[in-house]
Amino acid sequence: MLTAVLLSCALLLAMPPLQGAQMGPAPLEGIGRPEEALFLELQGLSLQPSLKRITEEQAEESLLQEAEAKALAEVLDPEGRKPRSPRRCVRLHESCLGHQVPCCDPCATCYCRFFNAFCYCRKLGTTTNPCSRT
């Protein structure tokens, strides 16, 4: 029994070298110079495009500008919203208390009064809200 276990262990240890498997990272010494590249016809091609270097402040500023522009476009575009189907929405001035469905008008919201005891769909308009112009 012991000989079978030892023989199995020896075979398992000898299998990778016999199959030509390489343990660990591949040796990459000497490939750093273009004249020693493996594929000389591909040495001029770059797989990754060169990136423009910018400072951290510039990157953060551009990211914030993109996020603000996207958020502003979503808020100021009520025409982009589709009217909801009448089966799954509450009409204007009807009770929306306890309903999990939205108001039919895309510019309306469920407005609650008296400690959320009385709720109905209503258009809330302000001077900055594009829905108030309708």
From Swiss-Prot:
Question: Which parts of this chain are annotated as the region Interaction with melanocortin receptors?
Answer: 113-115
The entry lists its GO molecular-function terms as:
neuropeptide hormone activity; type 1 melanocortin receptor binding; type 3 melanocortin receptor binding; type 4 melanocortin receptor binding
Site residues by UniProt (Cleavage): 84-85
Any single biological process term in GO = neuropeptide signaling pathway
Can you give the propeptide residue ranges?
21-84
Q: List the disulfide bonds.
A: 89-104, 96-110, 103-121, 107-131, 112-119
Which SMART domains does the record match to this protein?
Agouti
From the Swiss-Prot or TrEMBL record, state where the protein is found. Answer: Secreted; Golgi apparatus lumen
Q: Which domain of life is it from?
A: Eukaryota
Give the range the annotation lists for the signal sequence: 1-20
Q: Name one Pfam family in it.
A: Agouti
Q: Name one GO cellular component term.
A: Golgi lumen
Report the residue ranges that make up the Agouti domain in this protein: 89-131
Which InterPro entries does this chain map to? Agouti (IPR007733), Agouti_dom (IPR027300), Agouti_dom_sf (IPR036836)
Q: Which UniProt keywords apply?
A: Disulfide bond, Golgi apparatus, Knottin, Secreted, Signal
Quaternary structure (record): Interacts with melanocortin receptors MC3R, MC4R and MC5R.
Q: What does this protein do?
A: Plays a role in weight homeostasis. Involved in the control of feeding behavior through the central melanocortin system. Acts as alpha melanocyte-stimulating hormone antagonist by inhibiting cAMP production mediated by stimulation of melanocortin receptors within the hypothalamus and adrenal gland. Has very low activity with MC5R. Is an inverse agonist for MC3R and MC4R being able to suppress their constitutive activity. It promotes MC3R and MC4R endocytosis in an arrestin-dependent manner.
Domain comment, as recorded: The presence of a 'disulfide through disulfide knot' structurally defines this protein as a knottin.
Q: What is this protein called in UniProt?
A: Agouti-related protein
This chain's source organism reads Bos taurus
Q: Which gene encodes it?
A: AGRP
